[in-house]
């Protein structure tokens, strides 16, 4: 699924792109149906709080781990489809700013795990990283100063807020740019992730 700003059809402007991943057991509709990503974006844009951008939401249930088992979590198949096929397709069929610094990847829970794996393996593709209840980045993950423009990490206050906050502090102390957000009073749920998307945008 692809979200385009309301103004998209009215001109020839090119836009940055966010590749936004769902969690375990969900599909490409999750961020629209449960996450209300389109409404969050429309409101932020209408209020002049953010510059418009495109969101691509794709199916990510391609890893090898099985729910309830101790399987190896692999994003190899999804990585190939996303980076080698989907990104070029989106850049050729939509008016995107087709360069790393205008391309972000973020995800919730399992989608955050996919995001971390893929952004670190393909640093030439994405310039902005976002993990929502999906782990953290460490300074050792970032190999060069120009690898990423900003790292965003979030979770609910009933999850592991100290870990997210500490990770952002450590990244900033190492000279990288990172922000953390803790959704007050929420757990591993879409209220956390809706609020996180609002902050990320």
Q: Model segments located where?
A:
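Non-catalytic cap/lid and distal C-terminal segments of serine-dependent acyl enzymes
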Residues: 1-201
């Amino acid at each position: 699924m692809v979200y385009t700003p309301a103004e998209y059809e009215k001109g020839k402007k090119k836009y940055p792109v966010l590749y936004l991943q769902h969690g375990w057991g969900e599909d490409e509709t999750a961020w629209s149906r449960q996450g209300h990503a389109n409404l969050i974006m429309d409101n932020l844009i209408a209020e002049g709080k953010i510059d418009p951008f495109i969101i691509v939401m794709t199916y990510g249930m391609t890893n090898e781990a099985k729910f309830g088992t101790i399987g190896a979590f692999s994003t190899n198949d999804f990585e190939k489809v996303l980076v080698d096929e989907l990104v070029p397709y989106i850049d050729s069929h939509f008016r995107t700013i087709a360069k790393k610094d205008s391309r972000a990847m973020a995800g919730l829970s399992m989608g955050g795990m996919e995001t971390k794996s893929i952004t670190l393996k393909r640093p030439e593709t994405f310039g902005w990283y976002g993990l929502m209840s999906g782990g953290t980045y460490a300074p050792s993950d970032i190999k060069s100063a120009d690898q990423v423009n900003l790292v965003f990490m979030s979770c609910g206050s009933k999850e592991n807020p100290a870990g997210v906050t500490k990770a952002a502090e450590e990244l900033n102390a190492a000279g990288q740019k990172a922000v953390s957000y803790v959704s007050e009073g929420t757990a591993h749920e879409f209220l956390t992730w809706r609020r996180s998307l609002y902050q990320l945008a």
